[in-house]
């Protein structure tokens, strides 16, 4: 298992470190490090601190911040940037952009689980300029080219 360095920026978060809920979990819950409840009106976006910083350190890894499915489905709370990418060399605070795309106001409570952190492998590519590509079955077929329903 890979070890990731975590820096606790707020002492309240020392007992709230991201952890896998089950042996098969891919995501680690991130919590809102707030002093008081935060009201998100419909259409409003707020940047919410997690009270943590991470340093992945391994260029073969990155992290993505993803929405929690229950918050999105039940309350319309998703990420303002849709997906957050944390590069392996980033060492700053983890922040979550929460967007209320729902029709009702939503209150984010202190220490509420607001997003998930998933560690993913990264392959860095190098690019080579070519005049043409080798033939493939699909060719330049784009949207809708592989069939319908």
From Swiss-Prot:
- Cofactor(s) needed: Mg(2+)
Write down the InterPro entries for this protein, in alphabetical order: dUTPase, dUTPase-like, dUTPase-like_sf, dUTPase_trimeric
> What UniProt keywords apply to this chain's record, in alphabetical order?
Hydrolase, Magnesium, Metal-binding, Nucleotide metabolism
Q: What reaction is this protein's catalytic activity?
A: dUTP + H2O = dUMP + diphosphate + H(+)
- According to the UniProt entry, what is the EC number of this protein? 3.6.1.23
Write one Gene Ontology MF term.
dUTP diphosphatase activity
Pathway annotation from the record: Pyrimidine metabolism; dUMP biosynthesis; dUMP from dCTP (dUTP route): step 2/2
List, alphabetically, the Pfam families matched: dUTPase
Is Amino-acid biosynthesis tagged as a keyword? Answer: no
Mention one GO biological process in which this protein takes part, according to its record: dUTP catabolic process
**Cited NCBIfam families:** dut, PRK00601.1
User: What's this chain's function?
Assistant: This enzyme is involved in nucleotide metabolism: it produces dUMP, the immediate precursor of thymidine nucleotides and it decreases the intracellular concentration of dUTP so that uracil cannot be incorporated into DNA.
Supply the name of the protein. Deoxyuridine 5'-triphosphate nucleotidohydrolase
Q: Which organism is it from?
A: Methylibium petroleiphilum (strain ATCC BAA-1232 / LMG 22953 / PM1)
């Amino acid at each position: 298992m890979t070890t990731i360095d975590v820096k606790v920026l707020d002492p309240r978060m020392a007992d709230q470190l991201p952890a896998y809920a089950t042996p098969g979990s891919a995501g680690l819950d991130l919590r809102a490090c707030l002093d008081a409840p935060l009201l998100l009106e419909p259409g409003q976006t707020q940047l919410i601190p997690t009270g943590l910083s991470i340093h992945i350190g391994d260029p073969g890894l990155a992290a993505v911040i993803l929405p929690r499915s229950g918050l999105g489905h039940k309350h319309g709370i998703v990420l303002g940037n849709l997906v957050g990418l944390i590069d392996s060399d980033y060492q700053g605070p983890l922040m979550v952009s929460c967007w209320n795309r729902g029709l009702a106001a939503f209150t984010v409570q202190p220490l509420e689980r607001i997003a998930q952190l998933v560690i993913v492998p990264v392959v860095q590519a190098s690019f080579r300029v070519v005049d043409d590509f080798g033939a493939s079955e699909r060719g330049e077929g784009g949207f809708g080219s592989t069939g319908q329903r």
